[in-house]
Amino acid sequence: MRMKDLYAPTLKETPSDVETVSHEYLLRGGFIRKTAAGIYTYLPLGRRVLLKIENIVREEMNRIGAQEILMPILQPAELWKQSGRWDDYGPEMMKLKDRHERDFTLGPTHEEIVTDLVKNELRSYRQLPLVVYQVANKYRDEIRPRFGLLRAREFIMKDAYSFHSSWESLDETYELFKEAYSRIMERLGVKYMVIEAETGAIGGNASHEFVVPAKIGETNVLFCEKCGYQASDEKAEYKGEYTQEQEEEKPFKKVPTPGVKTIEEVSEFLGVPPSKIVKSLLYKGREGYVMVLIRGDLELNEAKLKAHLKDQSLRMATPEEILKDFGVPVGFIGPIGVDVKKVADHSVRGLKNFVVGGMEEDTHYVNANHPRDFKVDEWYDLRTMVEGDPCPVCGEPLKATKGIELGHIFKLGTKYSEAMKAYFMDENGEMKPFIMGCYGWGVSRTMAAVVEHFHDENGMIWPLSIAPYTVVVDILNMNDAEQKQVGEKIYQVLSEKGEEVVLDDREVSPGFKFKDADLIGFPIRINVGRSLKEGVVELKKRYSKELVKVNIKNGFGTLLETLEKMKREYDPKEAAR
């Protein structure tokens, strides 16, 4: 490919709405263009990277016996209603109606479609296990698309699904996917973590995420340096000590707290620590309102709440709903005298004489006590774990980091097969629901995550495995006939040997060519410039300042050997050392 023909419109300036390095460089490098919020067009360079990522993923899927299919993006609501997720999935689901007023969704995932497919095709345990996968677009109506490809409304995913006659068979396939995903990460060359994760709206009883550490990552990871425990903060369980206060219970009383709503304001106004205040949060779900109680110095973990109550439709009630149904502004909600289901974090159980909302504007109760003053229906671990909390395995203080989720695998069990009446006949002639697993990999997100991982102040540093092109040949003076001739010859020789090479034959300055080469991130650059008078060309790795001089007076043999050696030694991680 000649640079003058390559559709790669680079930008000198950073677009104003850019928030991350990957978003900036992919836009400036001419890999993507924004169509609308969270929706992107992939230009030729970006498409080449995507295809290479897809190829790696496909090879690893095929290696473990998965078979590729392609399912429809447009999905009928009936299937989602069968599974119970039409209402549970939440506002991220893009819903639409056809001209006959029938409901559809642009698929955020494909559990329903694939379960419906298989239940009409597989009848016997002899046909199991079956593993299928696809690489396709997915759609989620993100409330705030951000970070470029990392949180988009349209994105490319590989999603795989497995069907089994036994839990042992599912366990075996689950481990195969763990190994396959680890190999994908290793082929990308990135550091990664495999962490325990919450199943969320997908469901199931076990889940792991494959995460690339990154400061801008949206997955909060807790890990133990002693025993190796790793989990998302949504999943990590608190197994430490709880406060068990021994003081005598005092009579509760209502006190005026004018304009005092937040935990911090209440703490300062009443002169009590946040740990002596109980937050009362109202949620709405399938069964109506639920009041959630947690100690004031802790954060509620919504993922745990939804998992414990088995209701993914749960959401925090709006101030308008609370005012309409309870007659109280947000900030003064409390558990005393309120006839709704109450669930509480274990941190509340051992408290004495604490503060709660007074269920009346500008009012709180002090010296509230459980169970004297109100009843809790169910107790759970509902806190969000943070750095310094004890490891649930060995008790050592946990460390925290952030990461970008690329892969997520689930043991679904019979969640979908039972709901959608998908059965097979076992070896005893009995009808049993399929035992299922599902396995997602963010293909377009991988491109951004790799850039976040490998870059410098000049641009992207692609690993060889997914670089759009391996080599760029820069003719530094297009007015020099010898440079043009030699540059063209090197380009021709490399192309004939199957090398993915770009010839920069533009009528621009050497500095301009170097900046574009660094921004785009070509792994290896060959300079054909003034040193050609001595019969020398220069080779340079993207992340290195060293120029390797190669004499080509007697042909290109040494050049080709040097290039192969540089490719063998090429390691983007060197840039961080």
UniProtKB/Swiss-Prot annotation:
Location in the cell: Cytoplasm
User: What is a GO molecular function of this protein?
Assistant: aminoacyl-tRNA deacylase activity
Catalytic activity reads: tRNA(Pro) + L-proline + ATP = L-prolyl-tRNA(Pro) + AMP + diphosphate
* Entry's Gene Ontology cellular component terms: cytosol
Annotated PROSITE patterns = AA_TRNA_LIGASE_II
Top-rank taxon: Bacteria
Q: Which Pfam families match?
A: HGTP_anticodon, tRNA-synt_2b, tRNA_edit
Supply the SUPFAM superfamilies for this chain.
Answer: Class II aaRS ABD-related, Class II aaRS and biotin synthetases, YbaK/ProRS associated domain
GO terms under biological process: prolyl-tRNA aminoacylation
Report the domain remarks.
Consists of three domains: the N-terminal catalytic domain, the editing domain and the C-terminal anticodon-binding domain.
* PANTHER family in alphabetical order: MITOCHONDRIAL RIBOSOME PROTEIN L39/PROLYL-TRNA LIGASE FAMILY MEMBER, PROLINE--TRNA LIGASE
Purpose of the protein: Catalyzes the attachment of proline to tRNA(Pro) in a two-step reaction: proline is first activated by ATP to form Pro-AMP and then transferred to the acceptor end of tRNA(Pro). As ProRS can inadvertently accommodate and process non-cognate amino acids such as alanine and cysteine, to avoid such errors it has two additional distinct editing activities against alanine. One activity is designated as 'pretransfer' editing and involves the tRNA(Pro)-independent hydrolysis of activated Ala-AMP.
Oligomeric form and interacting partners: Homodimer.
Entry's family note: Belongs to the class-II aminoacyl-tRNA synthetase family. ProS type 1 subfamily.
Q: Give the protein's recorded name.
A: Proline--tRNA ligase
User: Which source organism does the UniProt entry give?
Assistant: Thermotoga sp. (strain RQ2)
